[in-house]
Amino acid sequence: MGCTMSQEERAALERSRMIEKNLKEDGMQAAKDIKLLLLGAGESGKSTIVKQMKIIHESGFTAEDYKQYKPVVYSNTVQSLVAILRAMSNLGVSFGSADREVDAKLVMDVVARMEDTEPFSEELLSSMKRLWGDAGVQDCFSRSNEYQLNDSAKYFLDDLERLGEAIYQPTEQDILRTRVKTTGIVEVHFTFKNLNFKLFDVGGQRSERKKWIHCFEDVTAIIFCVAMSEYDQVLHEDETTNRMHESLKLFDSICNNKWFTDTSIILFLNKKDLFEEKIKKSPLTICFPEYSGRQDYHEASAYIQAQFEAKNKSANKEIYCHMTCATDTTNIQFVFDAVTDVIIANNLRGCGLY
C-alpha cells in the first residue's frame, strides 16, 4: 500500500519530467545557435572570410554588390600603383625609363582630383600599363615589405587590360581581392549543418578595438586570423611595430582573457599562398631572430604556429589551427566544414549532450 503513488506525487513527477524535457530541448536549441567572433589585427583577412561565407552559405554577391564593388576595384588598382610610386621616391628607386615621369604625374593627378573610383580613361590605362611594365616600378614592388601596399596590388595591376575594358564587370574573385577598411561591426547570418550562425567581423586596426567589447557575451567560438605573410612588415598605425609581433600580442590577450575560459579558439594562419612565395626570399629571422630552421614553407609555418600555441596558458584549452587562403573559396569551404564539426562537438559537450 505504501508503494502506491499519490495523485499529487504522480503530478509532481510528471511536472519534473516535463521540466527536464524542456531543459533538454532548450539545451539542444542553445547548441544550435552559434555566435562566432572574427578577431585579428588589421588586414589579416577577416573581411574576406565574411565575403566567403556569403558565397558559400548564402546566395553569393547580389547585382547591387557587383555594382558597389566596381569603383572599389578601380580605386584599389590606382591607389596600389600610387603607393609604389610614392615608395620609389622614399626608397630612392629610379624609373627604368625617364619617360615614365610623365605617366607617374598623370596617375598622381587622377588621385589628386579624387577620380580614382571612376573607369580608367584610355590615357590613364596606357600610363598605368607602361608604369607597371617599368623595371624601376617592378624593383620597388619587390621591396613592398618596406612600405604599406595592398596585398592585391599585383592581382589587379597584372590584369589592367581586363579592368580597363568599357564593359568591365567585377568577378567574384575581384570582389574577394578588394580591400576596404572595416569600421564598426559587420554581422552575417547563415544556416549550415542545421546550425544558426551569427558571424561578427570587427575592425582590426588598433583604433577600432574598443568597439569589440559588447560582442563578447555568449560567444561560442573565436576565429582569430593572422596574416602569415606579414612577418617582415610593420603596422599602418605604428611603423615601428612588426605586424606578426602585434598579432601575437593580441592573440595572447584574447586567448588568456578570463571571459573566454570556455570559448573555443580557432586560429586561421591566413595568406598561406603569399607566405609560401615570400619565405623563399625574405628570412623568417626578420621577425623571429632565434629561428634556426630552413627557409621552407612547412618548417617556417610550423614554427609560426608553435609561437601562437605557446601563448595559451590554459592546460584545458585547445587551439584549433588551420592554414588558410581566404581568397580561395574551396579552401575556406573545407576549413569551415572542419571548424563546424569542432563547434558541434564542443557545444554539445558544453550542454551535457555529448
Curated annotation (Swiss-Prot):
Region G5 motif: what ranges?
324-329
Q: Provide the binding site for Mg(2+).
A: 47, 182
Lipid-linked residues (S-palmitoyl cysteine): 3
Q: What InterPro entries does this protein's entry cite?
A: Gprotein_alpha_I, Gprotein_alpha_su, GproteinA_insert, P-loop_NTPase
Q: Which region ranges are annotated with the description G4 motif?
A: 266-273
User: What does gene deletion cause?
Assistant: Prolonged exposure to attractive odorant benzaldehyde results in a loss of adaptive response characterized by a decrease in odor seeking behavior and in a loss of egl-4 nuclear translocation. Loss of chemotaxis response to the repellent odor 2-nonanone. Increased egg laying; eggs are prematurely laid at one-cell to 8-cell stage. Increased locomotion. Increases diacylglycerol (DAG) levels along axons. Increases paralysis following treatment with acetylcholinesterase inhibitor aldicarb which is partially reduced in a drn-1 mutant background.
User: Where is region (G2 motif) located?
Assistant: 174-182
User: What name goes with this protein?
Assistant: Guanine nucleotide-binding protein G(o) subunit alpha
Gene Ontology cellular-component terms for this entry are: cell cortex; cytoplasm; heterotrimeric G-protein complex; synapse
Q: Which UniProt keywords apply?
A: Cell cycle, Cell division, Chemotaxis, GTP-binding, Lipoprotein, Magnesium, Metal-binding, Mitosis, Myristate, Nucleotide-binding, Palmitate, Sensory transduction, Transducer
The UniProt-reported impact of residue 212 to A is: Abolishes binding to gbas-1
Q: Which parts of this chain are annotated as the region G3 motif?
A: 197-206
Where does the record place the N-myristoyl glycine lipid attachment? 2
Organism domain of life: Eukaryota
Give the UniProt tissue specificity note. Answer: Expressed in the ASER neuron and the intestine.
Annotated region (G1 motif), positions in chain: 35-48
Known role: Guanine nucleotide-binding proteins (G proteins) are involved as modulators or transducers in various transmembrane signaling systems. In the 1-cell embryo, probably together with gpa-16, controls nuclear rotation and spindle elongation during mitosis. During the first embryonic cell divisions, plays a role in gpr-1/2 cortical localization and in the proper orientation of EMS blastomere mitotic spindle. Polarity determinants (par genes) may regulate lin-5/gpr-1/gpr-2/goa-1 locally to create the asymmetric forces that drive spindle movement.
- Ranges of residues in domain G-alpha: 32-354
Its source organism is: Caenorhabditis elegans
Question: What residues does GTP bind to?
Answer: 40-47, 176-182, 201-205, 270-273, 326
Q: How does it assemble?
A: G proteins are composed of 3 units; alpha, beta and gamma. The alpha chain contains the guanine nucleotide binding site. Interacts (in GDP-bound form) with gpr-1; gpr-1 forms a complex with gpr-2 and lin-5. Interacts (in GDP-bound form) with gpb-1. Interacts (in GDP-bound form) with gbas-1 (via GBA motif); the interaction leads to activation of goa-1.
- Protein family per UniProt: Belongs to the G-alpha family. G(i/o/t/z) subfamily.
